[in-house]
Amino acid sequence: MKQYLELMNKVLHEGAQKDDRTGTGTLSIFGHQMRFNLQEGFPLVTTKRCHLRSIIHELLWFLKGDTNVAYLHENNVTIWDEWADENGDLGPVYGKQWRSWATPDGRHIDQLETVLNQLKNDPDSRRIIVSAWNVGELDKMALAPCHAFFQFYVANGKLSCQLYQRSCDVFLGLPFNIASYALLVHMMAQQCDLEPGDFVWTGGDTHLYSNHLEQARLQLTREPRPLPKLVIKRKPESLFDYRFEDFEIEGYDPHPAIKAPVAI
């Protein structure tokens, strides 16, 4: 994960001081890209321990089309609690947009099902895209989508994915985002009888919060360790039938966790 540390170092040394929605303040750069070859290992940050349970359950929650934190709570995941209302609802966030995008004529589009069909039947299409950035529903969302738009690409029997993330919390959020989309690529590839290719991450406002700077400097003193390997133990009937116990990470030997506050 040298690319991740290089990005963190760049933000620390080149970032502009900016105010932000949370009132915390950031060091920020605009426009950055990283590429991860998924054949070389699963891109889970090793210079601090990442909570893999939360990453997997959050992705399964998205895939269910769910927008209430009840499922997450059932699985001891609290990463969305700060934004949920008193009933646990978040409004039409990622799961709703991925699985049930509302059209003006009253229909609902399952973008993931559409993408799966494209990958299987028209893999050379340049329109294999999922968007969570629904302008008409942004004001109903507890948090506007940060990882907003992703595209799949098939070549030489391998499935690659590029994500555009309009806003990126480099210290806390980005390790989750990289691992989550890498996991999704592995799952989609398995369902389409392809091999995982590259995950390409493209960031817009890419920032370190002012109360994460010391933690970032500590992390930069640590030497990256070998990437772990993802094992998917079975091939379910569909993308939407995976369970938490289907996934195993082999050889994950990270440095200790580094705590930092979430900017809300």
Swiss-Prot record:
InterPro entries: Thymidate_synth/dCMP_Mease (IPR045097), Thymidate_synth/dCMP_Mease_dom (IPR023451), Thymidate_synth/dCMP_Mease_sf (IPR036926), Thymidylate_synthase (IPR000398), Thymidylate_synthase_AS (IPR020940). PROSITE patterns: THYMIDYLATE_SYNTHASE. One of its GO terms (cellular component) is cytosol. Gene3D superfamilies: Thymidylate synthase/dCMP hydroxymethylase domain. Pathway: Pyrimidine metabolism; dTTP biosynthesis. (6R)-5,10-methylene-5,6,7,8-tetrahydrofolate binds at residues 51, 169, 263. DUMP binds at residues 21, 126-127, 166-169, 177, 207-209. This is Thymidylate synthase. The gene is thyA.
